[in-house]
Regions:
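Conserved beta-strand hairpin/beta-sheet module of binuclear metal-dependent hydrolase folds
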Residues: 24, 33, 39-87, 168-186, ...
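Structured catalytic core of nucleotide-sugar glycosyltransferases
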Residues: 49-59, 102-110, 128, 158-159
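Active-site neighborhood of phospho(di)ester-bond hydrolases with catalytic His/Asp-centered motifs
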Residues: 71-74, 95-102, 123-125, 182-185, ...
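Active-site metal-binding motif and surrounding structural segment of the metallo-beta-lactamase
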Residues: 76-123
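Active-site environment of divalent metal-dependent phosphoester hydrolases
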Residues: 103-107, 129-130, 166, 190-192, ...
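Metallo-beta-lactamase
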Residues: 123-178
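Cap/insert and terminal regions of metallo-dependent hydrolase folds
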Residues: 192-290
């Protein structure tokens, strides 16, 4: 018997969401029925799987039944492949790697991964220059507010966001059939373009980097505190809550909070502050993407529970 995940919000902390679909839990022993099958073969929609998020590495798998795109590749190549294996995803099935900016925790093994897996590598020109990647030969560069098209109808829109000296972008992914997901980390504030695009999403993964009071009381030097909390730094729990309150709508089904600082934040603080800001009108789920991932405990299906996806 399948159970809707929304009724068991705190039972299992899995971090795979299927935009536009109902999410189900299923007994662990049932997994043997689907051993060796890619979970994307069983769904029609947009899958978002966080392989891990934080200052030591970031990677998010965006999938449809016909396409796998890795947004950021900040872990070592070995770690990334190990995390994909936990998700039962063959690295050679990755069609593309999209890098949001040049910082190592987002781009570290992207070039090696794209070459080994035969996946195309996409980034903006600023990222390519800072990483020393050769446009055309090694990567395809994109501009701001440019749509990237991938196999099977998946597309991604690149939204420029402010973060330190990097040319960072947020990603709005679409499956071409109405399901949309926003992936946004490493920014000091939300731009109007970003807010506009997030307002149409069914799923949002967004950073909630620090608790303001913890940052002020913490051991960081004042210069670093100012950088983190500045326009080009990171989003606080409060800022993230305000953004989600503004963009929340009846179609928003799930939120994942990412890139939490281990020194200046805590999962329960981030979750409670965001939920308080979003209010009772939001009926979806809020979860945390941890540094050590992925945590795969969810099954997802379409309208008929018999169409399952292994996670």
């Amino acid at each position: 018997m399948l159970m809707e995940r929304s009724s068991y919000k705190n039972l299992l902390p899995g971090l795979t969401y299927y935009v536009g679909l109902k999410i189900y839990l299923c007994p662990v022993e049932t997994m043997d029925l689907f051993k060796g099958r890619c979970w994307a073969d069983w769904i029609m929609g947009l899958g978002i799987t966080h392989l891990g998020s934080g200052s030591r590495g970031n990677a998010t798998l965006i999938s449809t039944e016909n396409c796998n795109v890795l947004v950021d590749c900040g872990f070592s190549l070995k770690q990334t492949e190990n995390r994909l294996a936990i998700a039962d995803v063959d690295p050679n099935s990755i069609d593309a790697v999209v890098v949001t900016h040049h910082h190592k925790d987002h781009s570290g093994s992207a070039l090696r991964a794209s070459k080994k897996w035969g996946a195309s590598l996409h980034c903006n020109l600023g990222t390519a220059i800072r990483r020393g990647w050769r446009p055309i030969e090694e990567c395809t560069t994109f501009g701001n507010l440019e749509r990237l098209d991938f196999p099977g109808g998946m597309s991604m829109l690149t939204i420029p966001v402010p973060h330190d000296d990097s040319d960072n972008v947020g990603i709005i992914a679409s499956d071409g059939r109405g399901s949309r997901a926003g992936i946004v980390t490493d920014l000091g504030e939300a731009t109007r373009d970003l807010v506009k695009q997030l307002s149409g999403c069914n799923h949002i993964s967004i950073e909630a980097n620090y608790d303001h009071s913890r940052l002020l009381r913490g051991p960081y030097p004042d210069s670093l505190k100012r950088r983190i909390s500045g326009r080009g730094g990171h989003l606080s729990n409060f800022q993230t809550g305000q953004i989600l309150q503004e963009v929340s709508n009846k179609n928003l089904q799930s939120v994942v909070l990412c890139h939490l600082s281990e020194s200046n934040n805590a999962p329960h603080i981030a979750e409670s502050e965001v939920l308080l800001a979003m209010g009772d009108e939001f009926e979806g789920s809020v979860s945390i993407s941890k540094q050590k991932g992925p945590e795969f405990t969810h099954w997802a299906g379409v309208e008929e529970p018999s169409k399952l996806a292994i996670v």
